[in-house]
Amino acid sequence: MDAAVSDDGWPPGFFDRQDRGDDADFYVPARLVTHIDEDAIAAVSELYDELGVPDGRVLDLMSSWVSHLSRKPSGGLVALGMNAVELQANPLADEVVVQDLNVDSRLPFQDASFDAVVCCVSIDYLVHPVEVLREAARVLRPGGVVVLTFSNRCFPTKAVRGWLATDEDGRVAIVRTYLERAGFEGVTTALRTKRRRGRDPLYGAWARSG
């Protein structure tokens, strides 16, 4: 485990953020832009395809106007995020839910109601990530997959302190620990893009529900 994570829990202040203001205020402006480059976006889509994400019902956590799936999921897509305008612009979404997971980590869905839960380049903003991922485990069907993708890009004032304080390898360790503490076993992590100067790296972490 990386030094950013202690053996008996998270270091004091790990989940503090520079901007302690209401997240709802921060996300009021609709940002109809992508936050990673084209190669990183392609890597997200390829990973989803490899894991069969589009072959069932999908929940996209902390979503926006694009979900980076190569096609519309056969079982439908629920996009949950902070900005209604962004979510309603998502062409793949069958249902949108506006919810701040930092205020309420409980997902408004029945047990075992999704085949995949994904979260793209947003895990670093959660102040209760383990609780949210336990909820992801609850709503996943047996054999369903949770997929977290992340890069080195973020809104630094809203990312948690522990994330900003470590390097990319440390962030991989953090995400693995989030998943393991949420009860997922057999977690896989990988760098999904080639290391190239000036390009965004894309890391993935995924696991199947029991």
List PLM regions with ranges.
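Class I SAM-dependent methyltransferase Rossmann-like catalytic core
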Residues: 2-53
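Class I SAM-dependent methyltransferase SAM/SAH-binding core
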Residues: 39, 43-107
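Short alpha-helix
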Residues: 43, 166-189, 203
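A short acidic, Gly/Pro-enriched loop at the edge of an enzyme's catalytic core
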Residues: 104-117
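A short SAM/SAH-binding and catalytic strip from SAM-dependent methyltransferases
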Residues: 115-130
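A short glycine-rich, Lys/Arg-flanked "PGG" loop and its adjoining helix->strand segment in the class I
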Residues: 130-145
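Conserved class I S-adenosyl-L-methionine
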Residues: 145-176
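Core SAM-dependent methyltransferase catalytic element
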Residues: 182-184, 192-210
